[in-house]
Amino acid sequence: MKLMIFTGLVLFAIVSLIEAQAENGKPCLPEYKVCTHAPGNCCSDLVCDCYGRYKSGAQIGRNCFCLQKGVIYKREN
């Protein structure tokens, strides 16, 4: 009985460790990928930059993309 309890605890610890490593090992989002729902997942040299979308002065949505840090993007006509 003690052996079964010990084995169960060891298996639980191993599964918990594997899940923790899987969460920490998530791949990061590369440049120009959408990060609206995952702002902290951009690769280390990128930042999740968000822009509001407006129509007739009312905000209709928001887009976020992984972009280079310190780079300023301007609209072209």
Curated annotation (Swiss-Prot):
GO molecular function annotation: toxin activity
InterPro entries (alphabetical): Spider_toxin_CSTX_knottin (IPR019553)
Post-translational modification: Contains 4 disulfide bonds.
The entry's keywords: Disulfide bond, Secreted, Signal, Toxin
Keyword Magnesium appears in the UniProt entry: no
Leader peptide range in chain numbering: 1-20
Entry comment describing in which tissues the protein is expressed: Expressed by the venom gland.
Compartment annotation: Secreted
Propeptide residues, chain positions: 21-26
Keyword Disulfide bond: yes
Cellular component GO terms held in the UniProt record: extracellular region
Similarity section: Belongs to the neurotoxin 19 (CSTX) family. 08 (U8-Lctx) subfamily.
Descriptive protein name: U8-lycotoxin-Ls1o
Organism: Lycosa singoriensis
Native organism taxonomy: Eukaryota, Metazoa, Ecdysozoa, Arthropoda, Chelicerata
